[in-house]
Amino acid sequence: MTYHNDSTDLETLEIQELETEMDDSMHEEDIEFNEFVDNTSEFEEAESNQQNEAIDGEHIANDQSDMDSTMTQLVTANSSKPDSLYLLPVKERPFFPGQTLPIILDKNSWSKTIKKVIDEKIHYIGIIYVEADDHHKAKPKDFAKTGTLIRIHEPKIKEDYIQLIAEGVCRFQIADWLSSSAPFRARVNYPNDIRNGSPKEFKAYGLAIMNAFKELLPLNPLYSEELKYFLNRYSASDSQHLADFAASLTAASNEKLQDLLDTLDLSERLEKVLSLFKHEIEVTKLQFNIRERVEENLSQQQREFFLHQQLKEIQKELGMVKDDRTADADLFQERLDKLELSEEATKKAEEELGKINMLDPQSPEYGVARNWLDWLTQLPWGKYSDDKLDLGRARKILNKGHDGLDDVKDRILEFLAVGALKGEISGSIICLVGPPGVGKTSIGRSIADTLGRKFYRFSVGGMRDEAEIKGHRRTYIGAMPGKFVQALKDCETANPVIMLDEIDKIGSSYQGDPASALLEVLDPEQNSEFMDHYMDVRFDLSKTLFVCTANTLDSIPGPLLDRMEVIRLSGYITEEKIQIAKHHLWPSLLEDAGLNKKQIQITPATIRHVIEGYAREAGVRNLKKQLAKLIRKLAIKFVNGDMEQTTLHVNDLEEMLGQPRFTPEKTNQQMGTVTGLAWTSMGGATLTIEASRVHTLNRGFKLSGQLGDVMQESASIAYSYIASNLDKYKADPEFFDKAFVHLHVPDGATPKDGPSAGVTMATALLSLARNEAIKKPLAMTGELSLTGQVLPVGGIREKVIAARRVGIKELILPDENRKDYDELPDYLKEGMTLHFAKHFDDVAKLTFHIRSKSSALKKYLSKAVISTEEKTEQETTS
């Protein structure tokens, strides 16, 4: 059930419809509040009458007689009050005598009850407060002690609800239950008010309530209609009805309102009502003060706005200031005069400037033209920074920022030397390729510092929208230029160093192919006339130096890769990592933690142990994480006061970093097992190849280890070559005819592919066929052809580093990779023994002992005799 407790709620759609349908008799009963005229003199006259009544005691008797007359009328009206009532439980708030409110009921829940009430001669029903959430399923214990008898006027049963006007008559209390479930019905009695006080006392209470009303009215205009109704219907002497009516207007809790309804002592009830009203006044005052402050702030802001507008208009009339359109046009014209625009850009700018002068500043086209001119005039047309081509200075900057990488530094210095001879450095596209954490991004920044150019970096990894490169067309809402135009604007020069990070991870989608869009940008023959879709004018990028980074070249499209000059950054060896940690990582981490070198020292042996046991990757990113973890562990002890300075030793690492993630790798010299060398995007690695014979009389060959197609083909070539040349390599010529061979590459969870393991697989198969392990610990790499030729492979530097890491000092490489090995720095070649093979015969001589043909034939014949005896025995048995 829903009913409305203030005049503002009467403005809802349902109540308006209900008021329209009310007949003339309802108007005579003063149910509609809107009939009262907003007349200030009426309120003043009522106030004057109240004051006169308080002063002149002679009127008290007359007022008492009026009250007696009113009570007589009430008794007459209530003489037909029923002994039993249908009850409407409500949970919103208690209903008070004297209230007249519209009520809306749920038809499904209360239609039976209302129909029974309508069928009776006088439409009486009881409204009583319940605490149950589901009030139409309330139990007798949920009902309050006291309810209100109401008279129903104009009940209307609609399609989904019932609407009626409820007029509160008097209090009732439940004496006995006739029906404890819906429709609720009970025998009731009607208690009388207890009047423990004189008429003067009650009248004083009435005046106090009226004064409270008068104090509340200026603070909350929502009470104006209720007050007019109040003044027209009640006087100060009618304290009983004043108390109930005043209580119905407060925002007190349901419990306090029900307590008022339960209170029969009139003096006590008036005290409680006054207390509630005083609280209502205090809350309303607080709300009024808050509202006043807010309105004052708003008024001040509005006043300032109007004054600014007036000032602006006055300044326009006096010629002291220009309007927005003129100001924008003058600003852009001033910028254009200072720029060295191309003829095409000048023509386009004049067209857009003409639009600025013609269009209304509020139109969308004006905003588009203004934004375009803003971008155009902020590009560095004809602005170039001076290159610093001092090679000595360049080498110092590179050495300061990076340890090792001498080949990369030399290549950068060569690039600068050519520029010094020409007097300028033309735009170039460099691609730095290497494992994560080897310093590709930092080298790009060092190149910019070396040249004295501005540096701008953005990542193209995961980029799928072509508009990120070449911008959006201006027809789109919120269109913006591409990344290269934004880079030129931020750098404010036309020859910055722009780094495209993670170019090997660029994507494509239905929105376009960013890699194809980069073809124009990264082509020295085309980027002198680069055209962004948003700008729609050509801009010269030929002086810009582009530096791209990638972990691998395999995923870069061929046409894009063809435009780049590739510089490989191989992984660091242990000695290089130690120097990087000592000179760069450790001091930087101490500074970030608020410590210094005197407080925490670390020995080179400790750094080496961290590298070999916890950070064996090609770069130094994970090494930095492990060193930072050590510093954090020690920082706790410094804060707790447990130490003032310390030196980290190898023995401290397991306690602080846990058990080592990596253990020393050992070469396996069992029969059929050979160590190979591999290259991945993470750097070089060793690769163990295992071959085993399954003893059956059936020929077969099986591969495992999650091998790619190319590696499977390499295995097939190795199998075919060894099987056809067993006699040549002094092995059993019929070995593969009677053996099912299984070739496995461990670490099966890691995908593997490539042709460089062909020689290693052939060596493992030959070891199995000869029943002989390789004669010394070594590692090898190379592609094998079907005729036994050893073909060149890539990643020689990474593979050499991987061999040094596991302690292998002897390697077999393809003869055509000799030049790649010779280019390696001396510190990588130191202590290494290299063999270069042109044919697999060279590999076999290095890996197996020389075996005479007679011994091999003797071994073969002995096996043949054993095989013949076994066959004869089987035939005899059968």
Swiss-Prot record:
Q: EC?
A: 3.4.21.53
Q: Which UniProt keywords apply?
A: ATP-binding, Cytoplasm, Hydrolase, Nucleotide-binding, Protease, Serine protease, Stress response
As for what it does, the entry says: ATP-dependent serine protease that mediates the selective degradation of mutant and abnormal proteins as well as certain short-lived regulatory proteins. Required for cellular homeostasis and for survival from DNA damage and developmental changes induced by stress. Degrades polypeptides processively to yield small peptide fragments that are 5 to 10 amino acids long. Binds to DNA in a double-stranded, site-specific manner.
Entry's localization field: Cytoplasm
User: What does the record note about the induction of this protein?
Assistant: By heat shock.
* Biological process terms in GO annotation: cellular response to heat; protein quality control for misfolded or incompletely synthesized proteins
Q: State the family it belongs to.
A: Belongs to the peptidase S16 family.
Question: Cross-referenced HAMAP family, in alphabetical order?
Answer: lon_bact
Q: Which residues cross the membrane?
A: none
Fetch the NCBIfam families from UniProt. Answer: lon
Q: Which InterPro entries match?
A: AAA+_ATPase, ATPase_AAA_core, Lon_bac, Lon_bac/euk-typ, Lon_lid, Lon_proteolytic, Lon_Prtase, Lon_prtase_N
List, from the UniProt record, the residues annotated as the active site of this protein.
S756, K799
What is the designated name of this protein?
Lon protease 2
Give the binding site residues for ATP.
Answer: G434, P435, P436, G437, V438, G439, K440, T441
Q: Which reaction does it catalyse?
A: Hydrolysis of proteins in presence of ATP
Q: What is its main location?
A: cytoplasm
The protein's superkingdom reads: Bacteria
> Can you give the residue ranges of the Lon proteolytic domain?
668-850
Transferase listed as a keyword: no
Query: Subunit arrangement?
Result: Homohexamer. Organized in a ring with a central cavity.
Identify the residues that the record assigns to the Lon N-terminal domain, covering every copy: 85-281
Supply the Gene3D superfamilies for this chain: 1.10.8.60, 1.20.5.5270, 1.20.58.1480, 3.30.230.10, LON domain-like (2.30.130.40), P-loop containing nucleotide triphosphate hydrolases (3.40.50.300)
Q: Which residues form a coiled coil?
A: none
